[in-house]
From Swiss-Prot:
It is found in: Mitochondrion matrix. Residues 1-35 form a transit peptide. The lineage of its organism: Eukaryota, Metazoa, Chordata, Craniata, Vertebrata. The modification N6-succinyllysine is found at residue 175. GO terms for biological process: ubiquinone biosynthetic process. This is NADH dehydrogenase [ubiquinone] 1 alpha subcomplex subunit 9, mitochondrial. It comes from the Eukaryota. Gene3D superfamilies: NAD(P)-binding Rossmann-like Domain.
């Protein structure tokens, strides 16, 4: 009798699962949808041990922004698939960011479509954070910002991915003097063509603990006087905090109205480059000695760093980007539209710049430093 009751329960459960699968399949239109999986059913009270219903593939997760995005996805109970090309020891810092079994690491080849298809086929969200500050003999800016995102977007669309998020740049412009920004603009277009519902994020220069923005300027103290084109009086910057960008990306994943939109992520204040670098040196308690260096001479210096066998501290393209004023894009939604209040630079700069202080000033209070002057241009 007990065996008969058990068999009836098994039959009911199997029928229920079949019915759920049939319903999930019947409501799918367009590209083929994968069968319902337990990881797609939200449950729990929130937190890393819950299930958010998000199965996200995050390309570029090992980079500066990627670790924050993975952490925010992991802490809400998402399953995160992390494609990587680096040594396994270089992804160890990501493992504690999710519950047991929720972070899956897969090796991939950026030029192999089968490899890309394998890492997106089980996801309902794909986030592309792939970027590079300088070109190499293996990957130039066109590869990184155009060809690879286009392939990922196309294969994600074919796999039935529900949400695709592509991170570009605020100053992406097909007519820009920077090859980096020109390819960013082309990348936006090809992604939009391949995945019309894609969400495009356009952040300004991002600052945070491991950035190449505040840290790059602060490290100039090693060279003595600080070279700035036109002393930085003709360039305006509006940097944004990395945690805000990460939260914005995650909120865009959860927002059903975000599909097909472009978002401009910027900080709350705009600064002349001169005042910004002066503030950076004040927080780092370093002597600020700026001098005007013509851009053609700056490019020549950058070329010397480019041909060195080490990671270039500056490149000719970075010189261009450094002296381009951040665009104002009031027609695009921003962080506020995703429920995020932008964090002022003055609140978080000390987290980044304390490491550049000498021992004498290591514990000095940030209140001793005057805030950077802001502009409205």
């Amino acid at each position: 009798m007990a065996a008969a009751a058990q068999s009836r329960v098994v039959r009911v459960l199997s029928m229920s699962r079949s019915a759920i699968t049939a319903i999930a399949t019947s409501v799918c239109h367009g590209p083929p949808c994968r069968q319902l999986h337990h990881a797609l059913i939200p449950h729990g009270k929130g937190g890393r041990s819950s299930v958010s219903g998000i199965v996200a593939t995050v390309f570029g997760a090992t980079g500066f922004l990627g670790r924050y995005v993975v952490n925010h996805l992991g802490r809400m109970g998402s399953q995160v698939i992390i494609p990587y090309r680096c040594d396994k020891y270089d992804i160890m810092h990501l493992r504690p960011m999710g519950d047991l079994g929720q972070l899956l690491f897969l090796e991939w080849d950026a030029r192999d479509k089968d490899s890309i298809r394998r890492v997106v086929q089980h996801s309902n969200v794909v986030i592309n954070l792939i970027g590079r500050d300088w070109e190499t003999k293996n990957f130039d800016f066109e590869d990184v910002f155009v060809k690879i995102p286009q392939a990922i977007a196309q294969l994600s669309k074919e796999a039935g991915v529900e949400k695709f998020i592509h991170v570009s740049h605020l100053n992406a412009n097909i007519k820009s003097s920077s090859r980096y920004l020109r390819n960013k603009a082309v990348g936006e277009k090809v992604v939009r063509d391949a995945f019309p519902e894609a969400i495009i994020i356009k952040p300004s220069d991002i600052f945070g603990r491991e950035d190449r923005f505040l840290n790059s300027f602060a490290s100039m103290h090693r060279f003595g006087p600080i070279p700035l084109g036109s002393l930085g009086w003709k360039t305006v910057k509006q940097p944004v905090y990395v945690v805000d960008v990460s939260k914005g990306i995650v909120n865009a994943v959860k927002d059903p109205d975000a599909n097909g939109k472009s978002f401009a992520f910027v900080g709350p204040s705009r600064y002349l480059l001169f005042h910004l670098v002066k503030y950076i040196f004040a927080v780092a308690h370093r002597l600020f000695l700026p001098f005007p260096l013509p851009l053609f001479a700056y490019r020549w210096v950058a070329r010397v760093f480019e041909i060195s066998p080490f990671e270039p501290w500056i490149t000719r393209d970075k010189v261009e980007r450094m002296h381009i004023t951040d665009m104002k894009l009031p027609h695009l939604p921003g962080l506020e539209d995703l429920g995020i209040q932008a964090t002022p630079l003055e609140l978080k700069a000390i987290e980044v710049l304390r490491r550049h202080r000498t021992y004498r000033w290591l514990s000095a209070e940030i209140e001793d430093v005057k805030p950077a002057k802001t502009v409205n241009i």
